[in-house]
């Protein structure tokens, strides 16, 4: 399977698992400007490459990258 199709399938799965309004808690983030572990937030949308765009409760808006970052789902929509 080519990389584009793999990313497309992953993004579709993430869009189903984490619809807008889903609450998540960050465990760890692989980013130099990471949101602190334990921060909670609300999913705004999942883009076409599978990044989960968040509104964090601390005011940040940094997206999660599911294959690199660790987080847990708190609520379903």
Language-model features, listed with the residues they occupy:
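Basic/aromatic-rich interaction segments and small domains that mediate binding to polyanionic partners
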Residues: 2-77
């Amino acid at each position: 399977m080519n990389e584009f199709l793999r990313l497309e399938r992953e993004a579709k799965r993430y869009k189903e698992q984490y619809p807008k309004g889903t609450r998540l808690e960050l465990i760890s983030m692989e980013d130099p400007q990471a949101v602190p572990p334990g921060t909670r937030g609300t999913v705004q949308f999942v883009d076409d490459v599978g990044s989960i765009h968040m509104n964090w409760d601390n005011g940040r808006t940094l997206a999660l990258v599911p294959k690199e970052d660790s987080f847990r789902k708190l609520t379903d929509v």
